[in-house]
Regions:
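Carbohydrate-active catalytic/glycan-binding domains of CAZyme proteins
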Residues: 1-246
Length: 246
């Protein structure tokens, strides 16, 4: 059956999911385990069934770490393209993944040069390390937390004049507002990080690979929820690049 996991503000950022519970159909109507009594989110495995979650090629569940250095020749199946094949905008190189930016951005209902991973937890940390030097003020690359083209955050590097800036921008109902920006050096790799604790999201960056600095403070994940943005598929975290402005 289908269900949801709301956060502490009763918002749903992980979308509609599939749940499995034992059903007792000894009476006139089926009764799910425990009936109307609240229950824990996990149950013991039935007798004779082995839990192979995260083993032998099966995807993990619960708390886990997913790390991808893009050293394989093909993309992991957990990476998602939007409105088109992933392979249309990525190139696997000796240094990792290279995104070839489209002449479109995530505010449009078009294919985007964004590689997405679904948000699976109400509490998580996601990070990406990139080497990037934009050529003009329309170039942008970084990460995004995305519900749809009208509701999302983008966190990445662009150019203003002769300088490079790290930008955090929030888009709600199609209206964008910059929550923070800071001048940044691009000679070395930059690590971009987003952390979530329920409804609270924080966007951080590291220029030395060790300590992280925050940009924009703590922001709400409200626009990433199905309550605010509509739909039922949940939010995604993405690696994003564009050549037409963010």
């Amino acid at each position: 059956f289908l269900g949801i996991r709301p956060n502490e503000k009763n918002r749903v950022n992980t979308g509609r999911e599939t749940f499995i519970l034992p059903v007792d159909w000894s009476g006139t109507f089926p009764v799910f385990e425990n009936g109307l009594i609240p229950m824990k989110p996990t149950l013991k495995m039935p007798s004779g069934v082995e839990n192979q979650t995260g083993k032998n090629g099966y995807l993990p569940s619960g708390n886990f770490v997913f790390k991808d250095d893009f050293s394989d020749k093909t993309l992991d199946l957990r990476w998602i393209g939007l409105r088109g094949p992933r392979e249309d905008f990525v190139d696997m190189t000796d240094k990792g993944l290279r995104i070839i930016p489209f002449t479109s951005n995530i505010n449009e209902v078009k294919p985007t040069s964004t590689l997405f991973y679904r948000q699976q937890h109400n509490q998580f940390t996601a990070a990406a390390t990139m080497e990037y030097k934009p050529k003009n003020e329309k170039d942008f690359a970084g990460i995004t937390c995305y519900q749809n083209e009208r509701y999302h955050y983008v966190f990445g590097i662009t150019k203003k004049g002769k300088d490079y800036y790290l930008i955090l921008q929030r888009t709600e109902k199609g209206q964008a507002s910059v929550l923070g920006e800071v001048k940044i050096e691009t000679e070395k790799p930059v690590t971009l990080q987003v952390t979530a604790n329920g409804d609270d999201y924080r966007f951080n960056y590291s220029i030395d690979g060790k300590g992280f600095l925050n940009l924009g403070g703590t922001v709400s994940g409200d626009i990433l929820s199905t309550n605010e943005a509509g739909g039922f598929t949940g939010a995604m975290i993405g690696l994003y690049a564009t050549s037409v402005g963010y």
